[in-house]
Amino acid sequence: MSAPQQQHNIQQQNIQQNIQQQQPQQNVQQPQQVIGQPQQQPVYKPVIQINKTLPQQQPQQQIPQQQQIYKQAPQQIYNQISPPIQQNINSPTIVNNTPPTPVVTTPTTTTTTTQSNYSTNRPNININPASPISSTTIASPVTPTVLTSTPPTTITTPTTTTTTSTPTTTSTTVITSGTGQPSLGSIESSIESVLRKNNLVNTTNFSPVQNIGTTTPPPSSTVVGITSPTLTQTTSSPITATSITPTITSIPTTTTTNTTSPMSIGTPSSTTPVVSSVLPTTPTTTSVTAPITTTPPSSSVTTTTTTIPTTTTGSNNSVQITGTNPMVYDSRQMANNSSNITSNPTSTINTPTTTTTTTTATSNSTGTILSKQKKEKEKEKERREREIREKENKDQQDKDKGLNSGGGGGGGIGNNNNPNNSNNPNNSNNPNNPNNIEPEVLGKRKLIELLQQISPNEKMDEDAEDILSVLADDFVESTVAFACTLAKHRNSTTLEVKDLQCHLEKNWNIRVPGFGNVEQYKTFKKPHFPENHKLRVAAMKKSIALTQASSRKQQIREFKEQQKELKEQQQQEELKQQLQQSKKQKLQLQQQQLQQQQQQLQQQQQQQQQQQQQQLQQQQQSPSSKF
């Protein structure tokens, strides 16, 4: 056989071995070629298979470099714990014969499978002792225990996350293989026994997976961990206690992740959880605040209870912190938790506890009772107020009747300072009173007096009087009402002048000095004038009187002169009128004379004409007679 054929066959064998390592579950049997038979099977058939599987070799080149980093840390930690476990197998120890009952949930599983050639015979369990959240951290010794193997079980590890609204619980599902490897349940029982020996477990409310926090390695490594949120606790007022009760909210939302990785070639796949357990030690002062679920409508009640330091024997009788998380466990969960607890050696613990609990009443019955009590109180208050109002209305009616009978429209102003008006400023407008008479604050007389003070020569119409009276009533009502509110604000039952002053100055810019404040009062003394000043004042008054008299005389003279002038003017006008009348009469007489003369002339002319005609007639008759 030639050399290139031998090299080719060797490469094929190496590739087949790599394929078998990558796929251990599939029993792939490929034909092996004999070196001495070059002409048996076709050479290119396995090459096709090689080309199909070649892309799967790429992650192998990157993973082995990082596998070595993650191989050492979990194994070293596990080797530190495993020797005392193997040495003390025959030693008498307390064994948890009752395995923890699993809490069955319906998680939404999201499986992520990664394959690698890395094979281990031990689970990568990272048990790191840690102390809870406290001001001081003290390491607790770990006692050797016996690990009992149990069949594969589904275990939920609730990790509480504290939020401002409704907290949620996330659980992780861990499945261990039954190939002789220690399961998670046995590890939990061992952790539980260690915690009990150190008196760190509350026997009534204990969950074996309460304090287990999970960590995840980088995504490039083959060791795939279980992803879940870590336990977060917020510190508040310190609570001195020797045990930490588990807190699980009532509305959990579970998210589970199942991861598988091959442990060895040819063996079924199993999970390799990387679990870091938190082993609480004996804390000196721990501050724990658990989430409190509230549902509206609720009435918050804050109670502070201080207990005398008690002495308890045995870890089963350890002090329980009450009120940290109400309505967490139901009866079934309490029964399941109680079944996982075993007896531990007794010890004496002195625990002075001071717990402050803040509870919320969420039941509907208590809410209805409180609402009924509030309604009854409101009804009683309304009843008392009605009685007070009726009494005040009666008193005010009597006073109003007395004022109206006494007369005087302005009398109603003084009535506004009555302390009864401070509680009910508008009692006069109450329609429930049948005999209610609205007093007029300002009558017509008062309005006329005010108008005369402003302008004495003017008068008012009836419409103006009505409008002014309405405006005055509104103004007085508004001022009294606002002043009453100020008096109520001062928690007083009497109306004072300063209330009215405050309202008038702020809203109307009206200042009323001389009331309320002592600073506004001023001392007034009569002035002492000397005699010279008095004489001067008298002389001044005389001179003023003389000047006034002389001015009056001058005015009288001027008036007389004016009257004389007026008389003269009238006389002149009368004379003129008389002259005109005389002239008219003369003209009329002349005209009459002319007319008479004309008439006489006409008569004479007529007579002459008649005479001439007679003469002519006579002359004519005369010759006829001659003939």
UniProtKB/Swiss-Prot annotation:
Residues 440-511 form the Histone-fold domain. Gene3D superfamilies: Histone, subunit A. GO terms for biological process: chromatin organization; RNA polymerase II preinitiation complex assembly; transcription initiation at RNA polymerase II promoter. Residues 368-400, 547-622 form a coiled coil. Its main location: nucleus. Part of the multimeric TFIID complex that plays a central role in mediating promoter responses to various activators and repressors. This is Transcription initiation factor TFIID subunit 12.
